[in-house]
Curated annotation (Swiss-Prot):
Assigned EC number: 2.7.4.25
GO annotation, cellular component aspect: cytosol
Organism: Aliivibrio fischeri (strain MJ11)
InterPro entries: Cytidylate_kin, Cytidylate_kinase_dom, P-loop_NTPase
Domain of life assignment: Bacteria
UniProt name for this protein: Cytidylate kinase
Pfam families, per database record: Cytidylate_kin
Catalytic activity: CMP + ATP = CDP + ADP; dCMP + ATP = dCDP + ADP
Family per record: Belongs to the cytidylate kinase family. Type 1 subfamily.
Localization, UniProt: Cytoplasm
Alphabetical keyword list: ATP-binding, Cytoplasm, Kinase, Nucleotide-binding, Transferase
Entry binding sites for ATP: 12-20
GO MF annotations in UniProt: ATP binding; CMP kinase activity; dCMP kinase activity
Length: 224
């Protein structure tokens, strides 16, 4: 094992199972957890709590740089703790998402949050969940995993999740939304979604989560 704090990055498209994998890896290894997908929502919520103007880079940058947030894997959920308070439910509100879109459009805020995310790297280690963790945020990470699955399989998983909540959804619509998002993510000008050159690419299309975890742990142990 290395004496410093190892970083394990897990990137991949929406619905591939990154969140579940990262939560289980953090629990098994006892590592810290970073959910980069939630970080802009967390900042937006902090701004709302403190009455900060969502359009003011000058006000948002110091808030982003000193963001007091923790991600804790508990059971099958990731708790998000902002300034000592569990804000997991608040993060899912539509108004939080809209506010997050505003702050994410500000270049200096993005740069400040990039530095803040890198500060999550601490003993005993870090599991970083995102889309550009291995390519942009932690390009020198010891372990990089790219978790993928076919668009059809991801749409099927999403449909089952929504049906369990009692929602009537159409497979074709979900598939179309996922394909459109994939296209945006893979072709955007800044930090397009792609595996790092030294990443292990895991295709979970025909794997269950236990099989994915076993392969990920084996790869991590071979690298550290």
């Amino acid at each position: 094992m290395t004496t410093h704090s190892p970083v394990v990055t897990v990137d991949g498209p929406s619905g591939a199972g990154k969140g579940t994998l990262c939560m289980l890896l953090a629990e098994k290894l006892g590592y810290n957890l970073l959910d980069s997908g939630a970080i802009y929502r967390v900042l937006a919520l902090a701004a709302i709590h403190h009455g900060v103007d969502l359009n003011s880079e000058d006000a948002l940058v110091p808030l982003a740089a000193n963001l007091d947030v923790q991600f804790k894997a508990e059971g099958e959920l990731v708790k998000v703790i902002l300034e000592g308070e569990d804000v997991s439910a608040e993060l899912r509100k539509e108004e939080t998402g809209m506010a997050a879109s505003k702050v994410a459009a500000l270049p200096q805020v993005r740069e400040a949050l990039l530095r803040r995310q890198r500060a999550f790297s601490a003993q005993p280690g870090l599991i970083a969940d995102g889309r550009d963790m291995g390519t942009v945020v932690f390009p020198n990470a010891e372990v990089k995993i790219f978790l993928d699955a076919s668009a059809e399989e991801r749409a099927n998983r999403r449909m089952k999740q929504l049906q369990q909540k009692g929602l009537d959804v159409k497979f074709d619509r979900l598939l179309s939304e996922i394909q459109e998002r994939d296209d945006r993510d893979r072709n955007r000008a800044v930090a397009p979604l792609r595996p790092a050159e030294d990443a292990l690419v895991l295709d979970s299309t025909s794997m269950n989560i236990e099989e994915v975890v076993v392969q990920a742990i084996t790869f991590i142990e071979s690298k550290l």
